[in-house]
Amino acid sequence: MKKIALLADGWRRYVIYSWVEGIMGGSKELGLDVCLYFYNTNGTWSQDSKFNKGEYALNDLPDLNSFDGVVFDCTNTTNLDEIQYMVRKLQSVNVPVVSIGYKVDGFY
């Protein structure tokens, strides 16, 4: 079984449900056994910087090296420092990373 982490920010449930359904459905069509771990922060929803910092701290909880791959979406992240922090973190792991909406050398 392949373990995939999906990291996203600020999406509401209908959009993310479609992503999970698409990833899992596509995996099944390809005959792949995938377990998807979804981490969705909401650091863009508040004017309270401490709240936002706490939300983004959730991204530090998973050991990303324990996954077979990571899907990274920061299209709703408005804090450039947070995007750059996550990019550096993802560049330091030894698994493939697919980046949605943000071009990073070395990511797919």
PLM region descriptions:
Residues 1-108:
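Alpha-helical recognition/docking segments in bacterial nutrient-uptake
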